[in-house]
From Swiss-Prot:
InterPro entries: Iontro_rcpt_C, SBP_3_CS, Solute-binding_3/MltF_N. Its main location: periplasm. GO terms for cellular component: membrane; periplasmic space. It is found in: Periplasm. It comes from Vibrio harveyi. This is Putative amino-acid ABC transporter-binding protein PatH. Residues 1-21 form the signal peptide. One of its GO terms (molecular function) is ligand-gated monoatomic ion channel activity. The gene is patH. One of its GO terms (biological process) is amino acid transport. Belongs to the bacterial solute-binding protein 3 family. The lineage of its organism: Bacteria, Pseudomonadati, Pseudomonadota, Gammaproteobacteria, Vibrionales. Probably part of a binding-protein-dependent transport system for an amino acid. It holds the Pfam family SBP_bac_3. Keywords: Amino-acid transport, Periplasm, Signal, Transport.
């Protein structure tokens, strides 16, 4: 009888520990992608942080934010040191074949940005022979290579600082999503301008590893996201950071 009680107590303790562990969610981000994720006065904040704070409340998650260079985030995800990446991750075919994704939560466009006064670049076709900066490991690097079949564009990768090299004339243009480019120009005051319209529409979502925990998180996050859309919370967070609903 005593042995049975010990086994039952141990099983209950193990079950409780499992439930507790499942509510701990580590969210990876760069902390350098204004206004999605950035640090101000030693506080991590932004659109992504507000979204996950709300998801955490609704799903009773204990959220831990893990910051790293963007180029290292997928490595952290694959080795289990984080549970997802919240850094405007575009759903490419290659990524969808490798990871589970929550439902898209941002719709945006791939945008060329140049030094102010440079009107010679208006689209991808004008980038031949030019040096174009992209963030290392971002989907924009591969997207640009897909357009540059003949290898005529000098694609230069950076961990950070692509906007400064374009402003200083060290690179002719950089590629990032249109929303971030607009906010970056507004925030930094650097002599930059958008070049033409976005050359590709993109949908961004949170990736998870395809395992038991990843599938559980995907379902729970999708449920919370749907509720947040329905009650206006997603729109409210979006308007706070962008002045418009960027999620549809």
């Amino acid at each position: 009888m005593k042995n049975w009680i010990k086994v039952a107590v141990a099983a209950i303790a193990l079950s409780a520990a499992t439930v507790q562990a499942a509510t701990e969610v580590k969210v990876g981000m760069s902390g350098r992608y204004f206004p999605f994720t950035f640090v101000k006065q030693d506080k991590l904040q932004g659109f992504e942080v507000d979204m996950w704070d709300e998801i955490g409340k609704r799903n009773d998650y204990k959220i831990e934010y893990v910051t790293a260079n963007f180029s290292g985030l997928f490595g952290l995800l694959e080795t289990g040191r984080i549970d997802t990446i919240s850094n405007q991750i575009t759903m490419t075919d290659a990524r969808k074949a490798k990871y589970l994704f929550a439902d898209p939560y941002v719709v945006d466009g791939a945008q060329i940005t140049v030094r102010k006064g440079n009107d010679s670049i208006q689209g991808v076709e004008d980038l031949a022979g030019k040096t174009v900066a992209v963030n290392l490991g971002s989907n924009f690097e591969q997207l640009l290579r897909d357009y540059d079949k003949d290898g005529k564009i000098n694609i230069k990768t950076y961990d950070t600082g692509i906007e400064h090299d374009v402003a200083l004339g060290r690179a002719d243009a950089f590629i990032m999503d249109r929303l971030s480019a607009l906010e970056l120009i507004k925030k930094t005051g650097l002599p930059l301008q958008l070049a033409g319209e976005p050359f590709e529409t993109i949908q961004n979502a949170w990736p998870f590893v395809d395992n038991e925990k990843g599938r559980k998180l995907q379902a729970e996050v999708n449920k919370a996201l749907a509720e947040m859309r329905a009650d206006g919370t997603v729109e409210k967070i979006s308007v706070k950071w962008f002045g418009a609903d960027i999620t549809k």
